[in-house]
Amino acid sequence: MSRVCDITGQTKSFGNKVSHSNRKTKRTYLVNLHNVTLFSDVLNRKFRFKISSRTLRTIDYKGGFDLYLLETSSRKLSDKAQKIKKMIKKATAENVKVSL
């Protein structure tokens, strides 16, 4: 079971534990992951992810799962998230053609 965010690909980071006497020892910072189900309004479908708390807060801030994916650059997204982003773009393009 890898500790990687399914949307952003965020993994553990490294740093130092600093004591009161300023002695430094190496340590790792693990990602705070949660199993969540996110709903896509455009696709009318649910997706299950294991995502970090930071990503979940960002999704809420952006206004939902669909808007988060559309506003985030593809370089910052994992392969799975990029595929869903393409599906959302395709669905919105089809909806625009139908409404015209």
UniProtKB/Swiss-Prot annotation:
Residues annotated as transmembrane: none
InterPro entries (alphabetical): Ribosomal_bL28, Ribosomal_bL28/bL31-like_sf, Ribosomal_bL28_bact-type, Ribosomal_bL28_sf
Keyword Acetylation on entry: no
GO CC aspect terms: ribonucleoprotein complex; ribosome
Any one biological process term the GO annotation gives: translation
Top-level taxon: Bacteria
Keyword field: Ribonucleoprotein, Ribosomal protein
Keyword field contains Isomerase: no
MF annotations from Gene Ontology: structural constituent of ribosome
UniProt record similarity statement: Belongs to the bacterial ribosomal protein bL28 family.
NCBIfam families the UniProt entry points to: L28
Protein's name in the database: Large ribosomal subunit protein bL28
Taxonomic classification: Bacteria, Pseudomonadati, Pseudomonadota, Alphaproteobacteria, Rickettsiales
Gene that specifies this protein: rpmB
